[in-house]
Regions:
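Formylglycine-dependent sulfatase
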Residues: 2-4, 12, 20-328
């Protein structure tokens, strides 16, 4: 049985709609119209000093600045952790990650870390008749204990913890497998070329950053010297799934496009979108539109790319005339 108490302090009061009796059809319709859409975008490894709104002078982030100027800004904020998996766990569950096992930085083949009996933020929105979606970086595991089988339907997944729709990066872009998962299936996977993933030892014969440094377009650091995919050495080893592999330069476009599609598809109903960007986490491989544009190297370039993503979401909301009824 799921319990609501963990997340009650975290849910916006606008979503906690409590009534007595049976509302008329008109009242129900008005209630639907009054529910704001909610978009929670979580960037990765972005510092307060990276944004021009907060004082950055060598890089400009006009779209994020516009968002800040139209809303609230926070100059004193805290997270449950400084790393990916535990901070996302705390955000979605309302629980301290150190009070549950296996909430350290998850490998790419980790089981689903959030207990399916736990009430998540997505569960609470869904209970209030929101259509819920998770798009982008996930890094909270997928599948059962013992590891994820990426060659069949992946269960449990985000749809077992409150999300109606998912299009996600299973872990992080610097970790294998380098594929997208949409609604429990690896996108573009050829069944004749199954994926194998291991974080203990090498699998298959794909080159690695350690053994074949001449093949990389980005030098490895901090253990990023295992299987090479798209010229980038990753953490962990994989083989197979050639038709499903992402292209790093296109990831921001793909994730942003899926988020926009989600918004357009559900513009006539209240929706909750949890969107995790790859930017500005390593490996920093910007699209050619942004490569070299900041004058500050790859990190500066992907900050520009992140700002573009925010701008695309804002433009979509504006074009659908739902920006004023969306908390972003």
């Amino acid at each position: 049985m799921k319990h609501l108490s963990n997340l009650l302090p975290y849910l916006p009061s606008t979503v906690l709609l409590i009534g007595c009796g049976s509302p008329s059809k008109q009242e129900a319709k008005n209630d639907q119209l009054q529910k704001p859409n909610v978009i929670y975008l979580i960037a990765d490894d972005l510092g307060i000093g990276d944004l021009s709104w907060y004082g950055a002078t060598k890089v400009s982030t006009p779209n994020i600045d516009r968002l800040a100027g139209q809303g609230m800004q926070f100059t004193n904020a805290y997270a449950t952790s400084s790393t990916s998996t535990p901070s996302r766990f705390g955000l979605l569950t309302g629980m301290y990650p150190w009070r549950q096992e296996n909430t350290g930085i998850a490998p790419g083949n980790s089981e689903l870390i959030i207990d399916t009996a736990c009430v998540t933020m997505a569960d609470m929105f869904k209970e209030e008749d929101y259509y819920t979606g998770a798009v982008g970086k996930w890094h909270l595991g997928l599948g059962p204990k013992g590891g994820t089988d990426f060659n069949h339907e992946i269960k449990p997944n985000t749809q077992d913890i409150g999300f109606n729709y998912e299009f996600i990066i299973p872990a992080t872009v610097d970790r294998v497998p380098c594929v997208f998962v949409e609604n429990a299936h690896v996108v573009g996977l050829d069944p004749k070329d199954p994926i194998t993933v291991n974080y203990d030892h090498k699998v298959g014969d794909w080159p690695t950053g350690l053994e074949n440094p001449e093949l990389v377009k980005m030098k490895p650091s901090q253990g990023h010297n295992n299987t090479i995919v798209n010229g980038i050495p990753r953490i962990g080893w994989m083989t197979g799934g050639n038709t499903a592999l992402w292209v790093d330069e296109d990831i921001a476009d793909v994730i942003t496009g899926k988020a926009k599609d989600f918004i357009v598809s559900h513009k006539n109903e209240p929706f909750f979108l949890y969107m995790g960007t790859q930017d500005v986490h390593v490996p920093r491989v910007p699209h050619p539109r942004f490569a070299g544009k900041s004058g500050l190297g790859p990190r500066g370039d992907v900050i520009l790319q992140l700002d573009w993503t925010v701008g695309e979401i804002m433009h979509t909301l504006d074009s659908l005339n739902i920006a004023d009824n969306t908390i972003f």
